[in-house]
Amino acid sequence: MSFVGGGGGQDVHKFVEALQADFKTLSLETKKKYPQIKEACEEAISKLCTAGSSQQNSVYYTVNQILYPLVQGCETKDLKIIKFCLGMMQRLITQQVVDQKGALYITNALWTLMENNIEEVKVLQTVTLLLTTNTVVHGDTLAKALVLCFRLHYTKNPTIVNTAGATIRQLVSLVFERVYLEKDSVPSLQQQQQQPSSSSNGPVEADGATAGQDVQTFASDAFLLFQDLVQLVNAEQPYWLVGMTEMTRTFGLELLEAVLTNFSAVFHESNDFRLLLKERVCALVIKLFSPNVKHRQLPAPNNGTAPVPAEKPYFPISMRLLRLVSILIQKYHTILVTECEIFLSLIIKFLDPDKPAWQRALAVEVIHKLVTRSSLIAFFCKSYDLKNHATNIVHDMIAAMGSFVRYSLINASVMLNGQQNGGVLAQPTNALSTLSGNNQCGFSFRGAYLPLVATYAPGVSKAVYLEMLDKLDAPNIPDSYGISVGHAILLDMTRSIGGVIQRTPELHPTHNTAVITEEEHQPLCLQLVNSSWSGLLSAFIPLVETSMDEATTENILKAMQNYAALCGMLEQLQPRDAFIMAMCRASFPPHYAMSIFANATQSDGDVRCHTRSGSQDLSSQFINSCTPDDFRPQIVAVGTPLPSASLPHSVMQAPVMLTNKNLQCMRAILFLAHNNGGILGTSWHMVLQTLQHLVWILGLKPSTGGSLQAMPKPAVEANVGIQTAVMADLPVLSQMLSQLFESSQYLDDVALHHLIDALCKLSHEAMELAYANREPSLFAVAKLLETGLVNMPRINVLWRPLTNHLLEVCQHRHIRMREWGVEAITYLVKSALQFKHKTPLKENMELQTMLLSPLSELSTVLHADVRQRQLDCVLQILNTAGEILSFGWPAIIEIIGAVNEHHGEPLIRTAFQCLQLVITDFLTVMPWRCLPLCISTAAKFGSQTQELNISLTAIGLMWNISDFFNQNQDKLMSTQLQDVAILPEFPGTVKMPQFDKLWMCLYAKLGELCVDLRPAVRKSAGQTLFSTISAHGSLLNPPTWQALVWQVLFPLLDNVRALSSSASNEKVDASGNILIHHSRNTAQKQWAETQVLTLSGVCRVFNTKRELLQMLGDFERAWSLILEFIQNAALSKNGEVSLAALKSLQEIMYHNTTTERTVGGVGGASLKDPQTTQEQDEEIWTIAWNIWLSIGMESTKMSTTKAQPQPSSNGGSNGSQDSQEDFYIPSQAFLTALIQIFPAIFHHIQVKFSPTDFDKFCTVLTNAVCIPVQTDAVPYIMSTVSDTLLTPLHDGILDCMELIQKEATKPDSHISQLIPAIFRQLLIFSKFACAPPTFQQNVEHKYAKSTSGHYANNASVEVVGMNYIPFGEKSISICVKLYQTTATEESVVQEQILHDIVKAVRTPLAMKYKCLSSSTWKLAISSLISVLHTGLKVARAKPQHFASLWDDLADTLDKFLFPASVCTIEDRGLEEIVLDETIDCHVIELLRDEVLPHAHEMPHQFIMQIVVLLNKGSIHSASDTNICYESDWKLREIFAKTCFETLLQFSLLEDHHATNNNRINANLLPAGAAGAVGKDFAGRLAVTALLHRFQEVLKRFNDDERQSGKCPLPRFRLSEISFVLKAIATLVVSMKKAPASKVNKPAWDQLIGLYPYLVDCTTTTSPEVSRSLREALLQYTDLLQAPRLCGATTNDNSIQSNGQE
């Protein structure tokens, strides 16, 4: 065993020294009473001295000798000595120097202490250390140590009992963990054990030699310990744990459980352990279970003689036994097969009704733990159910759970009825009536309510009563707890069975998990289903019927779906059909379901035994015991029953009432069929029959394509209705139905035929009923159609059976049957012809014949309505499939030519559909000369006013035409039309190609539609026009572009502007139309949308083709014109229009300049020389700048030309309204866009950017900032805020300022003279952080009322405050950075920019804590410090320009350091105040470093102000008006100290760079050194002021202390006087060291005058004040000297100087 230091001999030496010191202490303690211990200690010390001088590990050899005095000490019964000895033992153990013999000594000593009840907790700690530090303790010593802990566990002290219990659990686990070491289960632990041996000598080798013994011993110890635990639990004497006097069975069971839970590998790998487990533990468990098995809880007999009770089970024992059994089954089932069978059978018996409720609750919790693991279920089935002579554990368990669930429901009902019949008031929690309004989870049967008191995640068990280890008595079990857990068990059982069948791997497999081979899997799965299906079904049926909430029902139904699917996968038809039948029956009221499925139930003989009989049907029992009113809250739909041959007349007359649960079951059936349609087989008929009935009851009717939709009920059906909530679910149900039949495309051919046969069977039944003049169900026909549509890829598989049945339907005499039969056939034929088959239909004549055959056969039907639909279908086929059918094209021409002007809307619609088909599909085969006609025809349909949708679709057709032109350009260009008269002329363009004329014809027609009276048409036409130009404009020749711009686009803009200005402002009548949004409810607003669309579209075209237009001439005129259009729109009072105009302007301004240069320099070289291009460029950008400036000045000007209206005057109403119309607040988005345009313009005009331009620009910026924010713009600001919290507008403004600043600071910049103006503008912005701009307007105009734009009807525009703080702070930061780079610029110096900055930051610094944000003043002071670091140097160099700075600077510093605003800890917190004081100290440090060393270079008055400021801050009293709390005094101490030290440094001590010349007496200096004299004078003044302040504080303290009597002064007063006394001591020291010029005689006199006040302070009772006073008085020593008898030749100053020595 090695010493654990690992640090070499030095650590050993330290340890030995510590031991020696401890032994010396022990020797002193025992010297008088216990001399023998003293002698043993001295001997131990000598041993240690010898050991310390030898090798590192030699302490190990002497440990047994030095343990002797410690063991003796433990026998003294002296608590002090015992504690000391135990502490030394623990240190020896911790250092791992105790061997086996020493461990025995220590254990014996601890045993003695235990027997004498001394220091039990210390004893337990020592035992724990001894066993956990290493492995030297084993065998009998280990047993004795464990017995010691057990004995302490059964003392009377609860603290010791709990500590001992925890220790025993830890040590038992430790004993078994050691087994893992010898099994090499944890190689890293072995590696750690070997590491010390490789680096040590001596004893480690000896320990290594015993490693083999240890390995054998560890397993032996664990075996003996476990064996004795079993003995003790069995109330027998232990073999190994000798000395045990008592052991509770509960504690023993807990220890057994812990071992079996955590160390299963030990038992699985060792035969001895396995044998012990099988023979001893299992026998013990079975024996202890005896009371539980025999006990029966029976009601008392009537004769009053109670039977002799058997031994009553004890809850703590039973609960721990079941926990143990649970572990044995889960972890040891593979080695305890027979025993687990017994255990499982016992647990199942515990569910019997005659067992106590708590016993049943414990049993279901154990079962829940087991069923969540699919591997266990598989093992149970394989080991028991599959064996011939074994118990069918899985079957019995599930059957018992089913019985348990049913009993729980029936028992709750019986108990409730018994209470009510017996006159006892039933508990309100069990009465259903009291819970009718609650949506609680649970089950209800015959008025008894069983809430779900426990919920579990899927596959997770959570025991409640199995965890009650601290309970001595059986708890009261809620009535509903059993069914709550039982419900979860059934769900998890289903899930586990699914995991076995689908071979889902477990998340946490163990070595104990049973392996199921492929050969075993199939029989196992079949047996699982056979063992489980009847029990599960018998439990699920009552659970579904009695569940109260959707979530519970959903879980149960999902389990039934999954189980039915599993049965289908295994081809177990009987269980599959039984589960599906149960779900189908649950979808209807019981009496209705019995009538529907009467035949189905009789036909399946084997299934009937597992379905419900009348007496067993819990739902029918529930119905018989409840009134109809009980169902009212649950009923969500009431409908008429579907006529059926099986329904008796009485059922037909009564309405069918569906509950929410019925609909939930319907959804479950849909999910089952959708996801598992391939395994339904013959069950399809049952599923579809159920869905048909539900669809009928809910009123879903077939619509186009076979889908179902909810139709409004006739008003006469008063007793039929559907709740609103269900009405919302009907589309979802319809969609689910459609998806079910869409999924049929994934079925194989056999499954698909099963589905078709089931649908045809249902349809035949409906036809039979229709012959009796009953309303037929069209469900089957509709779904046959839907099934055919989704199976088009294999239409030949189902076409003949499908269409043959539909032809029969078409011949039916009932008109609705006929109507839907022909609808299905025609729809299928049209769809089949349009479908893209693998072999093209045009080539597959056989398929084409088969598809057209049913349509031809319809000619044999005599009914006229069927023939009409047939002809319509033929016409549609000719029109839609003309390329496939050779005779299709002539029919299209005939139909189009058949339309005349007098035809009504239906034929116009049909004709237009034909036109759509022609343009969409047949333009390629149309003659060239028809293309202009097609354009004009489409435009005619676009301008017709009968049907808006036709107009919009016609515009879409014009886009299709343009696409055709583009795709066939080569063909169209090569074809020359001889008859040119059909093409229009476009004047001004010479020899325009015919292809271009075709395009211009299209563009002109679209341009006319862009000014249609209908907004939707205008919008669609505009989008189409610009999309067409964008997509296909490149096909035009360059000269044609000029015609397009001047003859189409600019006239369009002019027309839109004119029509917009003349549009009405009255609300549009929306009667008969859809609702119109408020932003489009007037013609003016609708024209605004058009204006936005056209302007942005034209600008986009102009921008895209700018290079091309520049080459064609008239570009400047076009540029000016389009900018005028933009300016006109930007100044519109409609926010949408103005913002769109700015976006268009932005798009034009940010046009790619490199492209311009390329076109101008290369492409345009032949047209214009570079000089002309440059002049033109300058001219167009000057126009752009003027337009921008005009927009900016006008839009941000917040007063109107019609101001001062008189609203109260008689004739002033019109003027008031006009002024309100002219007044308009631009939005933040508008202003942001405006500002963001400037950088693009500035890039081109910066050379000519004058100070006047800058002033105008700043006017726009300032106005924009001051404009208030409207409430509707707040989301815009919030959604675009950056991390710096700047709004986009503020961000853009500062970006512009930085852009100009960056340009102005470049070398040889043209605009460098703007730097001072930039500073002033930034400082204007910075002031907004403290004083945000306010929007002031006349009362009549306040927050603008506008009758146009977004704010119609004179509604007030509400505005909100904007956060200007980030904007102002960012401005300050930019200003500081700019000043640091331009401080030495002549213009900056002359314009006194530093003074301006000081004045700007004075406001936030003076406000300080009154600032809106603390960041403002903090930024202001850091900015001031930064600029002063830079600016003071400039000020000293050029003092003539800074004369006005100093007073403002001193005033600013004073107001900041001593603010009027109060700050307390409650306001800001202690840390914040400390940080604030640190900032104040930084300011003082600035004065110390940058001002005071250069005092002779600064104005005398300024230096005096600084001295006064430092003096004011050097003592706390200077700011006593702002101090509200005692702790604040201390917070200013650092600041006061900094001020005081700075003052001393300035007034008394020499500068470190001073020369000898500076120390000459001030009177001897020439006049030129007045600055230095002023400095000395200021220093003396500072000393005098300090001394005067000291005297005031001392005097006031003495007076207050005398008046206070025995009451001590507040702490802050004592702190203040202590600081003053320390300051006096420091001042005296400094005055002694100061040169004579610094200190004059009056100062010494004043200092000496303080002495009486100091003497008065000696009466204080404060130790802190006394210490400080002592330091001050000691400094007066040098001032005390004998009076001189002879005259001195020196002057007073020299005397003082001598006195300083």
UniProtKB/Swiss-Prot annotation:
Tell me which SUPFAM superfamilies the record gives. Answer: ARM repeat (SSF48371)
Biological process GO annotation list? protein transport
Origin superkingdom? Eukaryota
Where are the stretches annotated Disordered? 187-209, 1199-1219
Q: Which InterPro entries match?
A: ARM-type_fold (IPR016024), DCB_dom (IPR032629), Mon2/Sec7/BIG1-like_HDS (IPR015403), Mon2/Sec7/BIG1-like_HUS (IPR032691), Mon2_C (IPR032817)
The answer to keyword Protein transport applying to this record is yes
Span of the signal peptide: none
Assigned keywords, A-Z: Protein transport, Transport
**Annotated Low complexity bias:** 187-200, 1204-1218
**According to its UniProt record, which protein family does this protein belong to?**
Belongs to the MON2 family.
**What is its biological role?**
May be required for traffic between late Golgi and early endosomes.
**Know the name of this protein?**
Protein MON2 homolog
Give the species this sequence originates from: Drosophila pseudoobscura pseudoobscura
